Amino acid sequence: SVIMYSTGNEVSETAQKKGIKLCENLTETLHVLDGTRPVTCGINIFFNFLSSMGLGVYSDKKADQTAKDVKKKKSVGSEFFNELAGVLGADFMKTGATLYPCDVKTKDAFAKMDVAGYNYGIKRYRHDLKKYPNRIILGSETFCADAYKFIEMAKEEPRIIGDFVWAGMDYLGEVGIGSWEYK
């Protein structure tokens, strides 16, 4: 069964005005097509903030420049961020997500959807539920080590509605791995 729709996962455009408007348009379109189900988008809160500073995976300017410079230097993309997480450990994303600028760069996008999809944002749940009394949170990506902690929070707070844990998979790859800009 379809329980909700998602407009994307780890799309860093949601840190920009253009991306927030796109998120709103996609949500409205899905509501017109099916008004019975909520809409979410999985946002990696910390990476969304980095994107707002020009360090994100995608941007119009970066795409144009990458096309020109593809042979000059390695692109910073999904592969880079996965390697960074491997070096720094899982906690850096969760802790980074608690920074005030991360809230500033996600609040407008979250306001355009029915369910806020938090990728690795478990350390924000309690704070954000107080700050945004109408927000419903979905753990759209969570580390295995946080599964029990998540369940305990969800038992206490009905606005935390579910969780997707990266546990094991038949890896088909990140959306960008293997694209023309990678090695």
In which residue ranges do the predicted regions lie?
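Extended substrate-binding grooves/exosites of carbohydrate-active enzymes
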Residues: S1-K183
